[in-house]
């Protein structure tokens, strides 16, 4: 396997990791049934691609893709307030199909012929798969740090409360509507960023890149890895992204494998492979503690010295 091909796989896997993390904000943290994340992935991709093909700056195009996806996500967030989980899932599926139809119809998106995008130049460097990979990894690290901080903040605790019981969250004075809209806005904006990276890394996009099957693929990544965690979507994205290479002999049945994995995980391990309540994660944690002893804190040392002096 050549290094160029390896970086091609890694860059795609990294972009889908970013996309899986975006869905996790909406579904894993806020508990909203989003089944059409590919629509917002596509919005970001087409927005960024249209800007750069018309001479715009690459970084500004990425920001624009985030903004457009985030605005549409906020609108969906408002709509979600009037829908129950099942109806929200169906609505987002419908939005995905509608957006694909729109991408096919508009002249500015290239219609059914798709859109060709030149490789961008960033800080004097013509972006290739290696640069896209490292740039996306940096974005993932930044996002993960922000998510860690968010989970420890009032915003993160409010989302956790809403996810567990929206009614109880309201009784504690949490503005459930506002936080749900914020979760949709942030999650879809990150999906738009992933879309902008994807469009320029591929050099060509068409509506099929954002079809409903892509949404199912991303949902599979998050569910298989573990909803509501940071490590889960990352692991799930890396696992699912590697399947095309592992399943080359059964390329026609790839979507069937994704669906089967998703059904099996929901049925037998709904917490995901490495979710917080997963037996696999529990076993790995015990193994880690056995071989890597916990560092003693100052309080532990004081307690030990006090016991030794008795």
Stretches found by the model and what they are:
Residues 1-310:
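Transmembrane alpha-helices and adjacent helix-loop boundaries
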């Amino acid at each position: 396997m050549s290094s160029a091909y390896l970086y091609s796989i890694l860059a795609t896997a990294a972009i889908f990791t970013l996309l899986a993390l975006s869905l996790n904000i909406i579904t894993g943290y806020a508990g909203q049934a989003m089944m059409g994340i590919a629509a917002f992935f596509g919005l970001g991709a087409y927005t960024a691609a249209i800007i750069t093909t018309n001479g715009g700056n690459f970084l500004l195009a990425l920001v624009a893709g985030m903004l457009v996806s985030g605005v549409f996500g906020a609108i969906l967030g408002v709509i979600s307030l009037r829908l129950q989980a099942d109806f929200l899932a169906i609505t987002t599926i419908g939005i995905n199909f509608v957006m694909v139809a729109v991408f096919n119809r508009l002249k500015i998106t290239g219609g059914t012929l798709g859109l060709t995008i030149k490789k961008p130049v960033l800080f004097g460097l013509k972006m290739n798969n290696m640069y896209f990979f490292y740039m996306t990894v940096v974005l993932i690290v930044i996002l993960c740090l922000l998510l860690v901080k968010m989970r420890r903040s009032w915003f993160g605790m409010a989302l956790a409360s809403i996810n567990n019981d929206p009614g109880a969250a309201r009784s504690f004075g949490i503005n459930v509507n506002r936080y749900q809209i914020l979760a949709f806005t942030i999650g879809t904006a990150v999906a738009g960023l992933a879309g902008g990276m994807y469009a320029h890394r591929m050099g060509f996009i068409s509506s099929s890149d954002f079809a409903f099957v892509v949404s199912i693929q991303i949902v599979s990544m998050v569910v298989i890895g573990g909803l509501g965690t940071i490590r889960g979507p990352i692991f799930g994205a890396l696992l699912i992204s590697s399947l095309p290479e592992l399943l080359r002999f059964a390329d026609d049945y790839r979507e069937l494998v994704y669906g089967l994995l998703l059904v099996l995980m929901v049925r037998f391990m709904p917490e995901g492979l490495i979710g917080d309540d997963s037996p696999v994660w529990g076993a790995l944690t015990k193994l880690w503690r056995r071989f890597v002893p916990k560092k003693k804190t100052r309080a532990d040392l004081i307690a030990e010295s006090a016991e030794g002096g008795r």
